[in-house]
Amino acid sequence: MKKQNIISPLLFGIAMCIATISNAQSPVSPVKKGSVTFMAGVGIGNEYNSNYYNQALGTKAALEVGLWQAGPGVITLGVQAGGTFSNGGGAFNNYKAHTLIIAGRSAWHHGWNVKGLDTYAGLSAGAGFNQYSYNQNENRFKQNEVMPVFGGFVGASYFVTPSFGFNVEAGRDITQIQGGIILKIK
């Protein structure tokens, strides 16, 4: 009688472990052909025109659509917008520089057969609206400039639910490195 009471829960436990392991190992790449994702993050901003005084703060948001299957991954096209902001210190306490950017972006996404994981690399190109200003004695200097901006980036996202996850991205883009969230809209 005692043997029967132990065997049933033991078999049930083994069956649950096998089901959990097999479900956790099923490859589900979050970014597929036809999917739409939105990401937003904050981090260290890139310095445009070398006119930043301190390390710039950067923020970026991007919207991507999965368009083409390319080998084991998906190629996406999208748009991104963001900015980098720097304020001076010391002798240049009134020095300010910022660049606002709007650009197109494309990336190749691959999930590595790990549920919820998305890694990617891509390129961006667009326009940057740069402004810096400072005071010198009684005079206020200000310069505005529109410039082409090009970037390259690598990143990874991990979806904790089918539609929400966390994202990190690094490269020579609007931000050098950033952390944020990602939403799968479709």
Per-segment meaning from a language model:
Residues 23-68, 173, 178-186:
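Short glycine/proline- and aromatic-enriched beta-strand/turn motifs that initiate or cap beta-hairpins
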Residues 47-51, 90, 167-168:
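A generic structural signal for short coil/turn motifs at secondary-structure boundaries
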Residues 109-118, 128-186:
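Gram-negative outer-membrane beta-barrel domains
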